[in-house]
From Swiss-Prot:
<comment type="subunit">
    <text>Component of the small ribosomal subunit. Mature ribosomes consist of a small (40S) and a large (60S) subunit. The 40S subunit contains about 33 different proteins and 1 molecule of RNA (18S). The 60S subunit contains about 49 different proteins and 3 molecules of RNA (25S, 5.8S and 5S). Interacts with RPS21.</text>
</comment>
<keyword id="KW-0963">Cytoplasm</keyword>
<feature type="region of interest" description="Disordered">
    <location>
        <begin position="210"/>
        <end position="261"/>
    </location>
</feature>
<keyword id="KW-0007">Acetylation</keyword>
<comment type="similarity">
    <text>Belongs to the universal ribosomal protein uS2 family.</text>
</comment>
<dbReference type="InterPro" id="IPR027498">
    <property type="entry name" value="Ribosomal_uS2_euk"/>
</dbReference>
<dbReference type="InterPro" id="IPR018130">
    <property type="entry name" value="Ribosomal_uS2_CS"/>
</dbReference>
<dbReference type="InterPro" id="IPR001865">
    <property type="entry name" value="Ribosomal_uS2"/>
</dbReference>
<feature type="compositionally biased region" description="Acidic residues">
    <location>
        <begin position="222"/>
        <end position="244"/>
    </location>
</feature>
<dbReference type="GO" id="GO:0022627">
    <property type="term" value="C:cytosolic small ribosomal subunit"/>
</dbReference>
<keyword id="KW-0689">Ribosomal protein</keyword>
<dbReference type="GO" id="GO:0006412">
    <property type="term" value="P:translation"/>
</dbReference>
<dbReference type="InterPro" id="IPR023591">
    <property type="entry name" value="Ribosomal_uS2_flav_dom_sf"/>
</dbReference>
<dbReference type="Pfam" id="PF00318">
    <property type="entry name" value="Ribosomal_S2"/>
</dbReference>
<protein>
    <recommendedName>
        <fullName>Small ribosomal subunit protein uS2</fullName>
    </recommendedName>
</protein>
<dbReference type="GO" id="GO:0003735">
    <property type="term" value="F:structural constituent of ribosome"/>
</dbReference>
<feature type="modified residue" description="N-acetylserine">
    <location>
        <position position="2"/>
    </location>
</feature>
């Protein structure tokens, strides 16, 4: 059975997936994830078939694009590495982001202020986002999940096999899904046109590391500005205007003229 051309993984996307370690799976394999294993390394780590990862990304994007109202898609991430990614995904596609702890009753208890009725739920990790998946099963909401080889597949309708523990892997998968959704909606005209948003925007950034880098940049700027400021004050020093008439001193030219040669 031949698949459409959109399901073919391009060399550029394959390089991105390998560079972000999307292919590095867990050592344990859940029975439903066995078809996604390419091979097992001598150290026991399972290598994920990135061709099947890409096929599931395209399938998930088609499901997302089929939802008429973009805000009816809820994207969840209790895992820290995925919170920035889901927020960026929501900003670019119009979905509803639930970053951080999932409040129990979000999908089932209509009395709560945070009550939502999405038509589709996407989670970063079936283990950390188990509450969201469980509530989705109660109200018949389909679930798309980023699954590692050891992730449970109960109540998951579409599993995207990938490394869902690395910050670069999680960010890249969300970026690829967002790009594919925008292609299907026609915002990105065709597959030859590159998306202006870089994958780095979806990667998790440690707040302490960001503050440290900002402080170091500020220090280097101060060190560079200090010599320039000293040089400016040295050359722009104002000279005092002296009134020679008040001081009683006569100019040298008058002294020479008055003297008898």
């Amino acid at each position: 059975m031949s698949l459409p051309a959109s399901f073919d993984l391009t060399p550029e996307d394959a390089k991105l997936l390998l560079a972000a370690n999307v292919h590095l799976g867990a050592k344990n394999v859940q029975v439903h994830n066995k078809p996604y294993v390419y091979k097992t390394r001598p150290d026991g780590m399972n290598i994920i078939n990135i061709g099947k990862t890409w096929e599931k990304i395209v399938l998930a994007a088609r499901i997302i694009a089929a939802v008429p109202n973009a805000s009816d898609v809820a994207v969840c991430s209790s895992r820290t590495f995925g919170q920035r990614a889901v927020l960026k995904f929501a900003a670019h596609t119009g979905a509803t982001a639930i970053a951080g702890r999932f409040t129990p009753g979000n999908f089932t208890n209509y009395i709560t202020r945070s009550f939502k009725e999405p038509r589709l739920v996407i989670v970063t990790d079936p283990r950390t986002d188990a509450q969201a998946i469980k509530e989705s099963s109660y109200v018949n909401i389909p679930v798309i999940a980023l699954t590692d080889m050891d992730s449970p597949s109960e109540y998951v309708d579409v599993a995207i096999p990938c490394n869902n523990k690395g910050k670069h892997s999680i960010g890249l998968i969300w970026w690829l899904i967002a790009r594919e959704v925008l292609r299907l909606r026609g915002i990105i005209p065709d597959r030859t046109t590159e998306w202006s948003v870089m994958p780095d925007l979806y990667f998790y950034r440690d707040p302490e590391e960001v503050e440290q880098n900002a402080a170091e940049e500020a220090k280097t700027e101060e060190v560079e500005e200090a010599p320039v400021a000293e040089a400016e004050t040295e050359w722009t020093g104002e000279t005092e205007d002296v009134d020679w008439a008040d001081s009683g001193a006569t100019p040298a030219a008058e002294d020479a003229a008055a003297s008898n040669w």
